């Protein structure tokens, strides 16, 4: 596991995932692929109070805003790093947004998507760790 070193916090960056520079992770080793936000993103959010999830069946393109996170600090859009069709959404995370903060790489996933492209253009764990370390 890579770690992004910050003077205040060490963040987990699991090596088996791929990342966008928008702080979204993708696990394309499972079908449909799983998508969520990184630990770094959850640190930036502060306390999440509401998550607006996409609808199952929605076709998304890379770069589309597909979900919204409302926190004590701001409302932030989740920008999809991949194109495809949303197959599942994590209603448990919508019901209790703290799941995303507490376990962003596990129970806090946001949606599962059937990918259009078998090889999306994403960052490795090491590449992403360098971005958040800067």
Regions found by a protein language model. Give the residues of each.
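Residue-level recognition of beta-strand microenvironments
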Residues: 26-28, 72, 89-92
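Small beta-strand-rich domains/subdomains or short beta-sheet motifs embedded
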Residues: 18, 52, 70, 75-80
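Conserved hydrophobic positions within beta-strands
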Residues: 23, 69, 78, 83-86
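Charged, amphipathic alpha-helical coiled-coil/dimerization segments
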Residues: 83-88, 95, 101
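A short acidic/small-residue loop/turn micro-motif
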Residues: 41, 74, 94-95
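Acidic, low-complexity mobile loops and tails
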Residues: 2-65, 98, 102-134
């Amino acid at each position: 596991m890579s770690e992004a070193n910050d003077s205040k916090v060490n963040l987990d960056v699991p090596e088996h995932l791929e990342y966008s520079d928008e702080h979204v992770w993708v696990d394309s080793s499972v079908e449909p692929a799983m998508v969520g936000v990184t630990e770094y993103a959850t640190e930036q959010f502060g306390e999440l109070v509401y998550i607006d999830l996409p609808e199952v069946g929605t076709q998304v393109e890379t770069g589309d805003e597909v979900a919204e996170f409302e926190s004590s600090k701001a409302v932030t859009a989740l920008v999809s790093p991949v194109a495809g069709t949303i197959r599942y959404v994590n209603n448990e995370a919508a019901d209790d947004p703290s799941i995303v903060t507490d376990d962003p790489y596990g129970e806090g996933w946001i949606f599962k998507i059937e990918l259009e492209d078998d090889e999306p253009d994403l960052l490795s764990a090491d590449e992403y760790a360098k971005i958040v370390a800067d």
